[in-house]
Amino acid sequence: MSRGSTNIMLRKLITSLKKQDKAIWVRVAEELEAPRRKRAYINIYKINRYSKANDIIVVPGKVLGVGNLDHPVTVVALSFSKPAKEKILRSGGKVMSLYKAIQELNDFKGKTVRLMKQ
């Protein structure tokens, strides 16, 4: 019986997240280490309800396209459904993968960062 993900890219992502000096990336790595059946799947309407304009939303899982988004946010996630991506971009927000986020989002000063899971 194997332990952990057999997806090599996911393992590398978890390792690089743990090496970051920000507590939020370590927390995301812990969430991604959990079994796939416990991974977060968040719909757009929850992001809309619990965020404000220009927030950074981190989802350690997949973002799904149910609901509408009426303000711009930056959403960082492991993966996105096609309708979710379209709705986020249509509202003026940004879509970013976790791989890209750990390289580009180093400074969170003055920004609200929210970790969302079920």
Curated annotation (Swiss-Prot):
GO CC field: ribonucleoprotein complex; ribosome
Xref: NCBIfam families: PRK04005.1 (NF003079)
InterPro entries: Ribosomal_eL18/eL18-A/B/_CS, Ribosomal_eL18_arc, Ribosomal_uL15/eL18, Ribosomal_uL15/eL18_sf, Ribosomal_uL15_CS
Gene responsible for this protein: rpl18e
GO MF terms held by the record: structural constituent of ribosome
Listed GO biological process terms: translation
Originating organism: Sulfolobus acidocaldarius (strain ATCC 33909 / DSM 639 / JCM 8929 / NBRC 15157 / NCIMB 11770)
Protein name from the UniProt record: Large ribosomal subunit protein eL18
Keyword Ribonucleoprotein: yes
Record family assignment: Belongs to the eukaryotic ribosomal protein eL18 family.
PROSITE patterns reported for this sequence: RIBOSOMAL_L18E
Keywords assigned: Ribonucleoprotein, Ribosomal protein
Domain of life: Archaea
